[in-house]
């Protein structure tokens, strides 16, 4: 019988730059998941890693640039927050979430326990900025205001793969166990209403399964077999993380079969040139298809 277990580690202590995160994880695992075992996948929310690495910002201490002031006027976003977005990466797209909520309010009302609170948070964040951070599109560039004190926010770790590697090394020193570490962050889904946790950093696990073209049950090469394992374990851990006051920022996934690797999430991202070529080819092929569709009506 194949089985995978997920243990959520509840952490009630305040976490800051003085916290020894690997030791804290090991101590909590002893009490809540029978310790750390070989081949465990330790999934950690990015917010916790950001707090330890000093990536929490006090908004009134940020000096906005002229560019940030300029954009903030058009997008009703505090210039300090706008400055952080611009620092994190290049803004690729802007989603007018408040306008969409005004037009399709029933979608938001169906998935909230407090209509008043939902309206308040949308007023505070009327636009979602999709920002290219190391070849990955992240909402607001990973800048997050939740579970931070008023007037504060957190940015994702500067180098999530390196953060995952360091934590993995420290866990190995403390326990003698070989594990994998994945750092997860919450992202809005663009194809349906809702959010899901995705991996922004990893160490010790092959991020993408290497089975493209492998034979299926009928012996035919399959167009597929490239599961995004780090995203899958992040989404699985999110079942226990929650999004509000669960105080469960770490999960241990046990029993998962995976290929060990020193590669990280950044290694699995599409190169920028591939992005540009894909868009160009997409546009050209769609123009071609539209023209052929018109011609097919003539013949």
Task: Enumerate the predicted regions with their spans.
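N-terminal and secondary-structure boundary signal
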Residues: 1-299
């Amino acid at each position: 019988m194949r089985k995978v277990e997920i243990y959520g580690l509840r952490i009630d202590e305040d976490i800051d730059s003085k916290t020894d995160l690997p030791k804290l994880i090991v101590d909590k695992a002893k009490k809540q998941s029978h310790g750390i075992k070989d081949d465990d996948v330790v999934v950690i929310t990015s917010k916790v890693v950001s707090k330890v690495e000093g990536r929490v910002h006090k908004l009134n201490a940020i000096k906005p640039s002229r560019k940030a002031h300029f954009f903030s006027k058009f997008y009703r976003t505090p210039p300090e927050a706008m400055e952080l977005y611009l620092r994190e990466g290049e803004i690729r797209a802007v989603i007018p979430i408040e306008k969409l909520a005004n037009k399709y309010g029933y979608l938001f009302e169906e998935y909230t326990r407090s209509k008043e609170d939902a309206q308040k948070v949308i007023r505070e964040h009327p636009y979602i900025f999709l920002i290219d951070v190391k070849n990955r599109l992240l909402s607001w560039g990973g800048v997050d205001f939740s579970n931070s004190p008023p007037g504060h926010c957190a940015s994702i770790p500067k180098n999530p793969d390196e953060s995952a590697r360091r934590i993995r090394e420290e866990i190995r020193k403390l326990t003698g166990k070989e594990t994998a570490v994945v750092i997860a962050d919450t992202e809005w889904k663009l194809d349906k209403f809702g959010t899901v946790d995705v991996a922004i950093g990893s160490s010790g696990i092959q991020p993408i399964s290497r089975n493209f073209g492998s034979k299926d049950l009928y012996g035919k090469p399959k167009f597929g077999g490239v599961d995004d394992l780090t995203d899958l374990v992040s989404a699985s851990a999110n079942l226990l993380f929650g999004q509000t006051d669960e105080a469960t920022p770490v999960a241990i996934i046990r029993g998962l079969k995976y290929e060990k690797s020193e590669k990280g999430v950044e290694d699995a991202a599409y190169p920028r040139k591939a992005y540009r070529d894909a868009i160009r080819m997409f546009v050209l092929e769609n123009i071609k298809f539209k023209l052929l569709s018109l011609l097919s009506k003539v013949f």
